[in-house]
């Protein structure tokens, strides 16, 4: 009897894990509906776990494109370029195309020392966190896409009111 209960428990646990994995897979949108990358471009996909409506609503995603370059230790570097938001016709989804001329700006401090290989990003985009939909980004070959996830804490804070003096 104990063996039968143990086998039944193992089977049920296996089924639950399988169903859970299938549900997570089914929630994600197939990225094949997005256009194939044009020549010289790479398609990047950001997929994040779905945390339910309440869990997703208090998060944001910041993503940025850039490339690794030899830089000095004391100047700040930034890549020129911007993201263009496009609509996936017939689906109601959006995707982003990163466009750049490859120019890099920097501060002009005098630095001595070794060069180091650093990721130099362009201006970032902040968007809603949605664990059910991937974020699709196209960037030129030689560039990479990175992202950060921001999460709001449940605490809220009161702003201070400022009294205005009368001018009478």
Pin down the residues of each PLM region.
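N-terminal signal peptide c-region/cleavage motif recognized by signal peptidases
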Residues: 18-19
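C-terminal partner/receptor-binding element of secreted or periplasmic proteins
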Residues: 128-168
